[in-house]
Curated annotation (Swiss-Prot):
It comes from Cellvibrio japonicus (strain Ueda107) (Pseudomonas fluorescens subsp. cellulosa). It catalyses: 3-dehydroquinate = 3-dehydroshikimate + H2O. Catalyzes a trans-dehydration via an enolate intermediate. GO terms for biological process: amino acid biosynthetic process; aromatic amino acid family biosynthetic process; chorismate biosynthetic process; quinate catabolic process. Its EC number is 4.2.1.10. The keyword Nucleotide-binding does not apply. Signal peptide: none annotated. The gene is aroQ. This is 3-dehydroquinate dehydratase. Disulfide bonds: none annotated. Keywords: Amino-acid biosynthesis, Aromatic amino acid biosynthesis, Lyase.
């Protein structure tokens, strides 16, 4: 059984309420529930953290190494375009990760096109709404050698 950490960045606590035309009507609790069901079926354990504070996400990444977390799925949200510190934390713990986004960041404002994570991630999944997380989890299962 692998442990997979799912990190949700700033403002994702407002999913379902904030700009539903861009981010959809699905709540963060709904996303986490779906992922938990998928992980249970595959025999894995998921941990979650949503934070609007960069340092909390960094601390959780550091703790993941100590805890033996096997994989990270991260939606850095607005930190995608600004956080060298989060990038360095992920590189520092040497845990494979997938970057995920609900919206297609490449169809949005130009400042959203740059990511500090995509060049060091196992992969990037964006533009499929809440399904982006499910696709990321399926990819994590494959990378970990688990049947999907």
């Amino acid at each position: 059984m692998a442990t997979i950490l799912v990190l949700h960045g700033p403002n994702l606590n407002l999913l379902g309420l904030r700009e539903p035309g861009i981010y959809g009507a699905t709540t963060l609790a709904d996303i986490n529930q779906t992922l938990s069901e998928m992980a249970t079926k595959a025999g894995h354990h998921l941990q979650y953290l949503q934070s609007n504070a960069e340092y909390e996400l960094i601390d959780r990444i550091h703790d993941a190494r100590k805890e033996g977390v096997d994989f990270i799925i991260i939606n850095p949200a607005a930190f995608t375009h600004t956080s060298v510190a989060l990038r360095d934390a992920l590189l520092g713990v040497d845990i494979p990760f997938i970057e995920v986004h609900l919206s297609n960041v490449h169809k949005r404002e130009a400042f959203r096109h740059h990511s500090f994570f995509s060049d060091v991630a196992q992969g990037v999944i964006c533009g499929f709404g809440a399904t982006s997380y499910e696709l990321a989890l399926q990819a994590a299962f494959k990378i970990l050698g688990t049947p999907v």
